[in-house]
């Protein structure tokens, strides 16, 4: 049955990426990309057949062996380009991109040539572009091509994000990690990992490599779990907890920035000013500063590097306007990120706080009602809308979020508009001076996937178009 199914599958090879390994007696082992829809159903059926046909655990063992071998072979193909690079990997549920960007700015200020690969931006030797791959970690081939280009450009430090998916899929096997930063662990990706324990174990694969330096969040709920891993060199913790080696002693929030004080090793006082607002960004900054301190970067370079980071696409990104309202686009798509974002924004908002949000399809469904509940409790107004439905029914996604909103008995705050552009338009149109509008979930992304189709889309650009329309109408009225 398995052989027959594989023969049928071979006819469909142009439709999706797959890899074949042939073994004796004409059996096959195959790895199929993460797909959904009709192709996803076929994939699931084939996996069921394989589980019945092969010995228990053989499918998972063979898949892991294949992924390990694939990474090694591709590394060889590109001439083992990661060797000779000083690679810093940032992992965690939230804050990876911002932390990586802070590290990048500090190292550049210290005179190092760097390369950066994050969900939002890619940069090699000062040449930056938006990451439009819709992937935090690219394919293995693209990753090693990135390393190769960095090496050719004379880069010394590479800073990148290491996701739980990439670590589980052995994308970093054989990559020499000099430093690992763990930002936090909160609910996300349970569609893939199933449990928080499995999610934590996937993140811990980075620490199992025994990098020279490890930086951990002392305030994080999962700190004790990750603290059991040792570094081959030094480990540093950061946070508001007095036991943290980099102790955050003072934070002052402003509308367009933050000031903070760090006490490192009970002796070094460091005063920092950043353009990024919010306590959550101060934590990201503290992680970056802790690593820079371990690397021996001068304190003045750390301070200047932190101050150099102006903004990150789709990360608390303000959209300029003449309407007298604050419009912020942010990537927040987990309960923890949304909660912290709403709490921070409330502190710097004079008027009402309006949230425009939805949830991504084909992802962890359990977080949807949780995010709905958070929105109802922390926002003054809610515009519930669609995000990227992938192959799910968007009505069902919104219904799950709505359950959380209705649980709070605050459904009167909510206006449901499926069309995302219309939801943003109505939020902007109904705002008054002093209000803040948060548009979350998509951040920097350049397209949406709806019903399996890739549609060009960017929240910031859509907001700018709507602002232009509103401003034109107001000018006509004044005439």
Name these PLM-found stretches.
Residues 126-131, 274, 448-452:
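Short acidic, glycine/proline-rich loop/turn micro-motifs
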Residues 83-85, 153, 177-327, 403-415, ...:
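Acidic, Mg2+-coordinating active-site environments of NTP-dependent enzymes
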Residues 168-169, 190-191, 223-225, 245, ...:
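Glycine/Thr-rich phosphate-binding loops of Rossmann-like dinucleotide-binding domains
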Residues 1, 10-12, 20-22, 26-89, ...:
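N-terminal leader/targeting and accessory segments in enzymes
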Residues 45-218, 222-233, 286, 292-295, ...:
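Phosphate-binding loop of NTP-binding sites
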Residues 34-47, 51-64, 234, 267, ...:
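ATP-dependent carboxylate-amine ligase
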